[in-house]
């Protein structure tokens, strides 16, 4: 066990520093913005140092473990730890949150509250990735919802209250399934009630009961991921939220659902996952085609990007259903890859809106001439979204293809059919991505309009864009950096819990 509480500090620091915002002198928003940005940078550097010097890549076991008794008779403890599956999302959380804080500098209304909520959300998002106790996982899962709801309801478009209410109804309803599943696992343990991940992973349940738990957890995580038909909150939320909030939603929040499917459904309920995996493959293929077909019909720019996120999450679901090392590693790479790409696209959509004050694509056109930097970065990241070779999206989807084709669970014809449908989805992706670029940047609609001069991307915005673009290219060229984190844990997970 690690004797220095690295993970506790990493979780507690942002929200504690957020409370100190209330005591900062009232000297305008500049002090608050710089304070929040410095806290995020310190947190990211602290996380990188702790993982860089104290995390062993070749060890599939839980590392940086902490265990402090809390409520003894319930076996509820402050139990933290990370492994190869959770380290990537935690680093992604720190990176995207830091850039989202920098992106939020134009926010001036209630700046003190806004930045406090950003830091509280930071703690709430790291919590589930590092929890090793089921009840602590649930508490962190719920803690993160409160700042998200307030960020959605207080800053955004005209229908922000509607989208925030829809978000909280969906997520709070799904949390009931999560809590019931956790209590069920705790009380159904064969020896004594337990809430620890490690102990629960070694428990065996009757098949019918395990399937019931699996369905409950799946519903809870399907809302967050999101998985159709529980996805309808996402386009509305993205369409109305401020773009810095959208960066956190697309880059981190959706990945929490996928992480939950791996950490609980796959690791704790292996037999049920093996039974339901063919259905995951079916749902994933339907989701890819459905979202890719629906996206071109969206007039709202951010809603179109939101549906592209739904389509990309379909690839992750298929990777989880493949039940082999290649497929699961590809799914984890897709989680990281889309975290960067989704956050970047929403940031660029928001910076475009700051200039032209238009949300509908059919009202845009001709922006490439007036804002060439935004046009260039938007084009490159759209290419990354449609899996251009050399970008992280291409590597992730290619490995997912290999994962399906090498899976031992499915017949050859089934694998060919799934691969064919996925290929159709990959063909549809350039249709909505390239048409989005055409409607926004090509033509002369805005260029010939009166007052058509727009200021191009400034140093701050260009820095945020490039900071996200560089990891996308780096992972596309050298994906082994991500695989070196997860490959040993994935191998241990599948060898221990799945039987052909």
UniProtKB/Swiss-Prot annotation:
GO terms for cellular component: chloroplast thylakoid membrane. The chain crosses the membrane at residues 4-24, 37-57, 84-104, 111-129, 134-154, 167-187, 208-228, 242-262, 272-292, 305-325, 330-350, 386-406, 416-436, 462-482. Its main location: plastid. It is found in: Plastid, Chloroplast thylakoid membrane. InterPro entries: NADH_Q_OxRdtase_chain4, NADH_Q_OxRdtase_chainM/4, NADH_UbQ_OxRdtase, ND/Mrp_TM. The keyword S-adenosyl-L-methionine does not apply. It is an enzyme of class 7 (translocase). The keyword Transcription does not apply. One of its GO terms (biological process) is electron transport coupled proton transport. It catalyses: a plastoquinone + NADH + (n+1) H(+)(in) = a plastoquinol + NAD(+) + n H(+)(out); a plastoquinone + NADPH + (n+1) H(+)(in) = a plastoquinol + NADP(+) + n H(+)(out). Its EC number is 7.1.1.-. Keywords: Chloroplast, Membrane, NAD, NADP, Plastid, Plastoquinone, Quinone, Thylakoid, Translocase, Transmembrane, Transmembrane helix. It is a multi-pass membrane protein. It holds the Pfam family Proton_antipo_M. GO terms for molecular function: NADH dehydrogenase (ubiquinone) activity; ubiquinone binding. Belongs to the complex I subunit 4 family. This is NAD(P)H-quinone oxidoreductase chain 4, chloroplastic. The gene is ndhD.
